Swiss-Prot record:
UniProt family annotation: Belongs to the Smg family.
Protein name per the record: Protein Smg
Signal sequence, start to end: none
Stored InterPro entries: Smg
Domain of life, per lineage: Bacteria
Organism of this sequence: Escherichia coli (strain SE11)
Record-linked NCBIfam families: PRK03430.1
Coiled coil: none
Taxonomic classification: Bacteria, Pseudomonadati, Pseudomonadota, Gammaproteobacteria, Enterobacterales
Length: 157
């Protein structure tokens, strides 16, 4: 499913291609690209749930907003998000790329993935997808995009 999401993000969303694509045509394009129907269905469902945030149909878990509070991860979250992923989320909060709400959206979307393995690079792409879809997060999206591509080029300052 994550491969389908990456393909969709890079092909349709990130490239600013026509975003209003007929779902049947999209499913056929993905099938023609070699993706499994179940993975396609799960990826589209994942994106629909993400769109619910954008449309205000869903809200992330509301947590205490005390700046001195610390996010405690559940065992399920720790299983999916290793120490490097959790540290990266904290780093993004500290540099104000993520806030409490967007962090919770990211965690919820990560837990909704069906990947057996999940790494820091995967998390970075999920963060980009979430920030891209949330109104008012354009600057955070741009910062995250810069971080992603600077790290990939080995030039993180």
């Amino acid at each position: 499913m994550f491969d389908v999401l990456m393909y969709l993000f890079e092909t349709y969303i990130h490239t600013e291609a026509e975003l209003r694509v007929d779902q049947d045509k999209l499913e056929q394009d993905l099938t023609d690209a070699g993706f499994d129907r179940e993975d396609i269905y799960n990826a589209l469902l994942w994106l629909e749930k993400l769109a619910d945030y954008q449309e205000g149909l869903a809200e992330p878990m509301q947590l205490a907003s005390d700046p001195l509070s610390m996010r405690i991860y559940t065992p399920e979250e720790c299983e999916r998000l290793d120490a490097s992923c959790r540290g990266f989320l904290l780093f993004l909060e500290q540099i104000q790329v993520l806030n409490l709400e967007t962090r919770e959206m990211v965690i919820e979307r990560v837990l909704a993935l069906d990947n057996a393995e999940f790494e820091l690079d995967d998390l970075k792409w999920v963060i980009l997808m979430v920030l891209f879809n949330i109104p008012g997060c354009e600057n955070a999206y741009q910062q995250m995009e810069e971080l992603l591509f600077e790290v990939n080029e080995g030039m993180l300052h």
